[in-house]
């Protein structure tokens, strides 16, 4: 998989891994890179089958497969302990990673995530999937900002949105890849397994998120042994993009609080074959 390692390179630097949502591209985290790189070693990557991580995502693909792919990448980089920050799909993948490799995660941040798919999120995914299947890639990409950003922010960033639309159409992950990744996300159900997540976990929500109601994050945190819920009042589903001035200090404070409080007992790290 395509990745970049940024920031601190000293031997005792702690590592923060950034995992994006359904789009999969590490470029999503641009507003956080400078801030995080000043304090941590930062790993940012394109998920398998997206961006520069070329490949065909098979039918029957699961969130567990995504977790194993990231574990394999980190093993190849000799990273046996890290903080993981995941947005939506990336955060839910992080929960699966925490269950499969408990010694790997020092802490976890799940941004606008959930325990099991909410009816509102399912409704939005069904609309987006129907757009893709019935109207094509450009229509899917054109509609995507409606689910990600607040209305006033959309009105004020027309040039950005046009540039983003062109870029996303040109670099689209492919219909089958997206549909298989989306199905894996929709099928994930952590209702009975969250008690096994030993890593301290921040469930961070946005009150005005159209795609994932903030109550999903509150529910998620309440089910975790070491869960905490924080809420931003503004920013939509992609509040790390729309309001980094609020988001970044929240994220940095959490990571710095967890840096000196490792969770669990390190055990042998299991190598995973890369796809």
Swiss-Prot record:
It comes from the Bacteria. Gene3D superfamilies: alpha/beta hydrolase (3.40.50.1820). Residues 15-116 form the AB hydrolase-1 domain. GO terms for biological process: nitrogen utilization; uracil catabolic process. It holds the Pfam family Abhydrolase_1. Its EC number is 3.5.1.-. Keywords: Hydrolase. Disulfide bonds: none annotated. It is an enzyme of class 3 (hydrolase). HAMAP family: RutD (MF_00832). Belongs to the AB hydrolase superfamily. Hydrolase RutD family. PANTHER family: AB HYDROLASE-1 DOMAIN-CONTAINING PROTEIN, HYDROLASE, ALPHA/BETA FOLD FAMILY PROTEIN. NCBIfam families: RutD (TIGR03611). Involved in pyrimidine catabolism. May facilitate the hydrolysis of carbamate, a reaction that can also occur spontaneously. This is Putative carbamate hydrolase RutD. The lineage of its organism: Bacteria, Pseudomonadati, Pseudomonadota, Gammaproteobacteria, Enterobacterales.
């Amino acid at each position: 998989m395509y990745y970049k390692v940024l920031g601190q390179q000293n031997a005792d630097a702690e590592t923060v891994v950034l995992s994006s949502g359904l789009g999969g591209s590490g470029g999503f985290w641009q507003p956080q890179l400078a801030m995080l790189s000043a304090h941590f070693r930062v790993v940012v990557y394109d998920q398998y089958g997206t961006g520069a991580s070329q490949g065909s995502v098979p039918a029957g693909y699961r969130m567990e497969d995504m977790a194993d792919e990231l574990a394999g990448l980190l093993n190849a980089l000799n990273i046996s302990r890290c903080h993981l920050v995941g947005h939506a799909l990336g955060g839910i993948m992080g929960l699966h990673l925490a269950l499969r490799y408990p010694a790997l995660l020092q802490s976890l941040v799940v941004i606008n995530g959930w325990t099991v798919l909410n009816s509102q999120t399912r409704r939005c995914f069904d609309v987006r999937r129907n757009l893709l299947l019935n109207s094509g890639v450009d229509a899917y990409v054109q509609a995507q900002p409606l689910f990600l950003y607040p209305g006033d922010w959309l009105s004020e960033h027309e040039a950005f949105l046009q540039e983003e639309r062109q870029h996303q159409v040109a670099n689209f992950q492919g219909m089958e890849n997206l549909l298989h990744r989306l199905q894996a996300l929709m099928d994930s159900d952590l209702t009975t397994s969250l008690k096994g997540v030993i890593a301290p976990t921040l469930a961070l929500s946005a009150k005005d998120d159209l795609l994932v109601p903030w109550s999903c994050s509150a529910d998620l945190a309440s089910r975790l042994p070491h869960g905490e819920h924080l809420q931003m009042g503004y920013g939509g589903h992609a509040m790390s993009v729309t309001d980094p001035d609020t988001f970044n200090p929240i994220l940095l404070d959490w990571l710095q609080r967890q840096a000196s409080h490792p969770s669990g007992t390190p055990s042998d790290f299991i190598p995973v074959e890369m796809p």
